[in-house]
């Protein structure tokens, strides 16, 4: 709290500290239970699908050709921490990649992704605009057939910019999608714009968190219910919750050294209300 710039920021930091502690206690209590109902067994499976650890260390245990889709939201190598700090957004626990290491990092991730995909499958990869050539080239080098026009998340908000006098406020993020084999889209004819508000700040647990509702839409654009998804960099874990909403099985990894994000994820699973996980309804 001593690092807070003002009283308002100190209150936000204290709130986050308190919430993190409560989520950690909730996660520990749930995972310690011995007798589980069927619904609780499903929750336990979802909790266990979030593995804490380095993707590069753990992916070797994933068998070949077992996944229908892989959703990759890697570090962007754009000094996100510096950008978010300038915008007073806390990025504690976020790990970035040095620009000089990024091409090799990408190719290693894509090589493993190609291995664990079935003979026909999709990879979805989010990226920073300045890395478009490198991301596309790395996907193609390992064998993927890449659609050269990205998909776009369009946020109907005011947007963000650090230099309003010279730069327009950004309201879009983008992903490349590529296929292995002869896989086809499930929502054929759908356009490449996904119009969704960001996850509400009051419930957001990760600096790059994407709304569950949007991830559900994206997943069902590419694969049918019942498929399996791997998420190399889980963050908030919302992709796994979106997958569960549409009857998909999923698993993934995150470094998350202090279990902050995994505890928040487990807390969401344990305290699920209604038939589906959601980002937006949590605020109502």
Model-identified regions with their sequence ranges:
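Conserved SAM-binding loop
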Residues: 263-266
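Core catalytic lobe of class I
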Residues: 48-253, 257-260
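Asp-based, Mg2+/Mn2+-dependent phosphohydrolase catalytic module
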Residues: 215, 252, 273-284
